[in-house]
Amino acid sequence: MFCWLSRLCGELSTPTRRTTQLIWSSAARSMVLSSQRIPELSSFVARTNTCGELRSSHLGQEVTLCGWIQFRRQNIFLVLRDFHGLVQVVIPQDESAASVKKILCEAPMESVVQVSGTVISRPPGQKNPKMPTGEIEIKVKTAKLLNSCKKLPFEIKDFMKKTETLRLQYRYLDLRSVQMQYNLRLRSQMVMKMREYLCNLHGFVDVETPTLFKRTPGGAKEFVIPSREPGKFYSLPQSPQQFKQLLMVGGLDRYFQVARCYRDEGSRPDRQPEFTQIDIEMSFVDQTGVQSLIEGLLQYSWPSDKDPLVVPFPSMPFAEALASYGTDKPDTRFGMKIVDISDMFRNTEVGFLQDALSKPQGTVKAICIRKGAKYLKRKDIESIRKFAADHFNEEVLPIFLKTNENWNSPVAKFIMEEQGLGLVKLLETQEEDVVLLTAGEHKKACSLMGKLRLECADLLEARGVVLRDPALFSFLWVVDFPLFLPKEENPQELESAHHPFTAPHPSDIHLLYTEPHKVRSQHYDLVLNGNEIGGGSIRIHNSELQHCVLDTVLKEDVKLLSHLLQALDYGAPPHGGIALGLDRLMCLVTGAPSIRDVIAFPKSFRGHDLMSNAPDSIPPEELKPYHIQVSWPMDAETEKSSSNHPCRSES
């Protein structure tokens, strides 16, 4: 391809040549999955072959291809594209083929055509080893315009920048890009391998659970669906949690589902109102069994073009994750761990450190940024300090190490020589390192330092320091979570850390009735590169224990879950499971910047479908059967005026 371009158009500018090369390199990337494809790609359709499958072994064969016109040069060559790749087509120049030439030369880019012709070898010196079909081209005999393309809102090329709004508005065009094709086809293949692993190798049953359900207490907000019964509503389930537990009561033993789930969480850029999870439940299983299953599942379905996964994945208690990384989903690809240096400052004269250590759970935390003085500017440090003040109402002190004995910091004069040497040893500091130090209540201080750890990693990587290898997939199990957490609005009351069906740790059941805030759960999260991609637990299978958790601890209305409590009374087996977030997993596997890039038709970050303009209004006559009347919000002044109107009637 590059050779004939050079032969035909040596006058091309450098940017144009680079653009052409990018087209082909993108196409080559789409071939990564070719070896995994089943044959018979052209069965039942009008073509004999796909554009990307032809090789020198097909020389002399008569073929029929269907695809989109991606590139044309001087009305002599064009590039035809389909889902499988690209192929070069030679446009006939003789008079007898004038009609064929007219079709192929006049059809706009991205028009759909069908061509028939002979597979021939490219002339010597014009073969392209970087392209799977680079040894051959198609000498066209007949052509048919299947559909012409109007002027496009954007070019169908991955390297052409498009706003996300435009991409979502014309999603059907965006799906033609090499990257979107790769993402969705890889997603399909991984799901297929997961089904094979679960059903064929381990006897799981694929069961579809209802989408229309009833509102359940706790957890995320649910979408409400009206019914034709006055005042009664369905809700869309945020997960099949209750149904899969009921399937265990029903003796299904091993269940899985590629489940659609729904959460009404408003405008969140990293979430979708509807999403997909690989939902799994097993009877007679413990935590180790579920974790081993998932490790095998991911290992079996992992893309062949990536390094194989090493199992078992490491495990880390929640308390350690918080203390060392400041989060329950640590990115373990790089260090910069949080270190507790409270003992170094028990007798300090620094005011805010003294205040923090005098309070319950008061602590002093630090992180060491290797060569931070070399890469971070003063404005970066000030930005970090401002972030801490604005979001955590905490102070952060920087310490610059010119040498191990020379500290440049506002607190340097308060650090005795013995303390300084102790800090150097504890933090393993070196010349040009920067230490960030804060103090406060343990959880809050850890959370702040966890945020600053990631912020500093972003700053260092922006300066060219590689900390988080994008090709490295660092899986981690986080375990031993608390079963309950204080409510934000009322810390005296408790809520489930995950959901109310999670079983307490066997060693802590006795605390459930006296000190429930100390009870650990049998919950486990699967973390990948600092992102939670799965969560599960061993469930409560005893009706009395479940009733106690709901009624006594959480103060929930048990009537809403009477069906589940009743089912647990009829010989429910011990059971547990997990759900893997398929969208998030695929986002990380493909390296996509957003989960919207691995979903065929996603919503915007505000939850809108920009292609169809959903959600949309419904005429009042269509709402009437559902006994719904829309009341439009009014500003305070309008509402006051309306309430004082003399004609307003009370009802």
Swiss-Prot record:
The modification Phosphoserine is found at S239. L-aspartate binds at R263, R539. The modification Phosphothreonine is found at T216. CDD domains: AspRS_core, EcAspRS_like_N. Residues 241-244 are annotated as: Aspartate. Keywords: Acetylation, Aminoacyl-tRNA synthetase, ATP-binding, Ligase, Membrane, Mitochondrion, Nucleotide-binding, Phosphoprotein, Protein biosynthesis, Transit peptide. One of its GO terms (biological process) is aspartyl-tRNA aminoacylation. ATP binds at R263, D264, E265, E532, G581, L582, D583, R584. Its EC number is 6.1.1.12. One of its GO terms (molecular function) is ATP binding. It catalyses: tRNA(Asp) + L-aspartate + ATP = L-aspartyl-tRNA(Asp) + AMP + diphosphate. The modification N6-acetyllysine is found at K379. The keyword Nucleotide-binding applies. GO terms for cellular component: mitochondrial matrix; mitochondrial membrane; mitochondrion. Residues 1-44 form a transit peptide. It is found in: Mitochondrion matrix; Mitochondrion membrane. Belongs to the class-II aminoacyl-tRNA synthetase family. Type 1 subfamily. Catalyzes the attachment of aspartate to tRNA(Asp) in a two-step reaction: aspartate is first activated by ATP to form Asp-AMP and then transferred to the acceptor end of tRNA(Asp). Homodimer. This is Aspartate--tRNA ligase, mitochondrial. It comes from Bos taurus (Bovine).
